[in-house]
Amino acid sequence: DNSITDDLIDRCRVSKFDGMCLTVDTLVAGNREKDHRTGFTTPPKLTLQSLMSFAAHPNWVFNYFTHGKFEMSNVKNKTDKGTNIAKSVIEYINEQYDPAMSWKDAEYCVKKWNGPFALKGVMSVEDAKRAIDIGCTAIMVSNHGGRQLDGSRSPFDQVAAIREAVGDKLEIILDGGVRRGTHVLKALAAGATACSFGKMFLFSLAAGGQQGVEHLLQNMHDEINRNMVLMGCKNLKELNSSKLIYRKKN
């Protein structure tokens, strides 16, 4: 629904956001086998299995019923999908996303935003170059946590080739598999501008709330600093390919 896209872009502009990101690797939902097996939906459906789970987790149930209902806040005035109607993530993606989205659609969003813009889900040199052509200022090298295309390449393995091909024309953000400070250092040494991570924030938030997230960030900060000292690097500019040793391929 282009009206939803236009509305979101306009709202971001009014709210003075600095940049925008378009995810391009979820045109259809991946085969989420665990979701199929568990019947996971939002909000949860009442089944014998879910009722038994609720009984075993009273704190979760109390938290669920004492807080606001789950809703897609960004689009709640445009659609009721994902609010009162129990839907699986797979169903929502397949109903709301357009599998026919093309480079033309991405370029439309770039021009309408008219500011720093990233494409998330770029995994090849050719697509990185195309992103430059349509006006993107950054890409997120990501395979969506390996949950979309089965057997997809590792994002880390694509960074060096993409950086060599695009030079300093794009910021390259490595997404996926980043769990430790050393992972960040390896990515930067390979040519990434920065790293991003999602599940780490969600796990920390679920386990410890805001303090959990702050603890995560402090751990990451300490690991990066500690390992830079151990590597003999005074600043991030000293992280380059000479700091990496790749396993030889047979």
What do the PLM-derived regions correspond to, one by one?
Residues 20, 117-120, 140-141, 172-176, ...:
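Hydrophobic faces of well-ordered beta-strands that scaffold small-molecule active sites
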Residues 1-133, 145-148, 157:
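Active-site entrance/lid segments in N-terminal catalytic domains of soluble metabolic enzymes
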Residues 132, 137-174:
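Extended hydrophobic/aromatic segments used for targeting, binding, or gating
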Residues 157-174, 178-250:
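Alpha/beta catalytic cores of nucleotide-metabolism and tRNA/nucleoside-modifying enzymes
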Residues 22, 109, 131, 139, ...:
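Conserved, mostly hydrophobic/aromatic
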Residues 127, 154, 183:
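Residue-level recognition of oxygen-bearing side chains
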